[in-house]
C-alpha cells in the first residue's frame, strides 16, 4: 500500500542538451526552452495541489534554477532548498563536451548507448589536459563538499552514481520522507535514473531501457519501507512525454542522412 509520495525530475533543457553534447559536471545554464519546461512543471504540480516542505537539488545551476522556477510557479518560493554534489549528473569523464551523434559515428551507436545508459560501463576518465578539467575542479563548490577534492570522481558508471547518491538518500532525504514531508528532487537524467533503480528495484540489465526527458515531473508512490508501489509515473501529456523520451534516445544515434 502506498504511504508516501515523492516527486523527482530531470532539470529543464540546457544549451548543451540542445547541441547534443555530454554536459555532465560542466555548469551549463537552462536555455529558454528549459526555463519554460520548468515553469510548465510547476504549473502541473500546482494543478495537482502539491505543497512541498523541502527541495533537494544538485550543486549545478540547471538543477537549482529548475527548482526555483517550479517553486515560483507554485508560489512556494519560501520552501527550503538544499543542494548536494551527490545529486549531480553522472561524471562522463573524457566524453564531457563531446557531441553524442559524432561519437556514434566514431565509435558506433551501441558503444554510445552503453556509455549513456548501461549500469556498469565507465567512460574513459577526464585528464588534466581536458578543456573542461580546470573549470570543474577549480570551482569553489567542489572545495566545500563532504569529501576531499582529490576523491571526487573523474568518471562514473551509473553504478558509481548510485553508490555516491545512496548515502545522501539514506541519511538526508529518506528520513524527511519518513517524517511525512512532501519532497521535490530536482536532479539530472542519471542521478534520477540511479535513484529510480534503487527505489523500484530495477535490474542492472533493465535500467538501460529507462530514459527520462527534461522538465517532466515524475511521481513515485512509496511504501513504509520506501520501496516503490508500482512503476514511476510521468505527469503530463503522455503523448508529448513519449515523443520527448524518443528525442532523448535518438541523441546517441546517427541521423539517417549521415549513415
UniProtKB/Swiss-Prot annotation:
Q: Which organs or tissues contain this protein?
A: Expressed in red blood cells. Expressed in non-erythroid cells of the placenta; present in the syncytiotrophoblast layer of the placental villi at the feto-maternal interface (at protein level).
State which Enzyme Commission number(s) the record gives.
5.4.2.4, 5.4.2.11
User: What GO cellular-component annotations does this UniProt entry give?
Assistant: cytosol; extracellular exosome
Q: From the UniProt record, give one GO term of the biological process aspect.
A: glycolytic process
PROSITE patterns reported in the protein's UniProt record: PG_MUTASE
The record places the site described as Transition state stabilizer at 188
**Positions marked as site (Not glycated):** 29, 46, 143, 181, 246-247, 253, 258-259
GO MF annotation terms? bisphosphoglycerate mutase activity; hydrolase activity; phosphoglycerate mutase activity
Q: Which reaction does it catalyse?
A: (2R)-3-phospho-glyceroyl phosphate = (2R)-2,3-bisphosphoglycerate + H(+); (2R)-2-phosphoglycerate = (2R)-3-phosphoglycerate
The protein's recorded glycosylation sites are: 3, 5, 18, 43, 159, 197
Keyword hit for Transit peptide: no
On this chain, the residues bearing N-acetylserine are 2
According to the record, the protein's activity is controlled as follows: At alkaline pH BPGM favors the synthase reaction; however, at lower pH the phosphatase reaction is dominant. Inhibited by citrate.
- Description of how the protein assembles with itself and partners: Homodimer.
What job does the chain carry out? Plays a major role in regulating hemoglobin oxygen affinity by controlling the levels of its allosteric effector 2,3-bisphosphoglycerate (2,3-BPG). Also exhibits mutase (EC 5.4.2.11) activity.
Name the family the entry cites. Answer: Belongs to the phosphoglycerate mutase family. BPG-dependent PGAM subfamily.
Name of this chain's protein: Bisphosphoglycerate mutase
Per the UniProt entry, what species is this protein from, by scientific name? Answer: Homo sapiens (Human)
Amino acid at each position: 500500500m502506498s504511504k508516501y509520495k515523492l516527486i523527482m525530475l530531470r532539470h529543464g533543457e540546457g544549451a548543451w542538451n540542445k547541441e547534443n553534447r555530454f554536459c555532465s559536471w560542466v555548469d551549463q545554464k537552462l536555455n529558454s526552452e528549459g526555463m519554460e519546461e520548468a515553469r510548465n512543471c510547476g504549473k502541473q504540480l500546482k494543478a495537482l495541489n502539491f505543497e512541498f516542505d523541502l527541495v533537494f537539488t544538485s550543486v549545478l545551476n540547471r538543477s537549482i534554477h529548475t527548482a526555483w522556477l517550479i517553486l515560483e510557479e507554485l508560489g512556494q518560493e519560501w520552501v527550503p532548498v538544499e543542494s548536494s554534489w551527490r545529486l549531480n549528473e553522472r561524471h562522463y569523464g573524457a566524453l564531457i563536451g563531446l557531441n553524442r551523434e559524432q561519437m556514434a559515428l566514431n565509435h558506433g551507436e551501441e558503444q554510445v548507448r552503453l556509455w549513456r545508459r548501461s549500469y556498469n560501463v565507465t567512460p574513459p576518465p577526464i585528464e588534466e589536459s581536458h578543456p573542461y578539467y580546470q573549470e570543474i575542479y577549480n570551482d569553489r563548490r567542489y572545495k566545500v563538499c563532504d569529501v576531499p577534492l582529490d576523491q571526487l570522481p573523474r568518471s562514473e558508471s551509473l553504478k558509481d552514481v548510485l553508490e555516491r547518491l545512496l548515502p545522501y538518500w539514506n541519511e538526508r532525504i529518506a528520513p524527511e520522507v519518513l517524517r511525512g514531508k512532501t519532497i521535490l528532487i530536482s536532479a539530472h537524467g542519471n542521478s534520477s535514473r540511479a535513484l529510480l533503480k534503487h527505489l523500484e528495484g530495477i535490474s542492472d540489465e533493465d535500467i538501460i531501457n529507462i530514459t527520462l526527458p527534461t522538465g517532466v515531473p515524475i511521481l513515485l508512490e512509496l511504501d513504509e519501507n520506501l520501496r516503490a508501489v508500482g512503476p514511476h509515473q510521468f505527469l503530463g501529456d503522455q503523448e508529448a512525454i513519449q515523443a520527448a523520451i524518443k528525442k532523448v534516445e535518438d541523441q546517441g544515434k546517427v541521423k539517417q542522412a549521415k549513415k
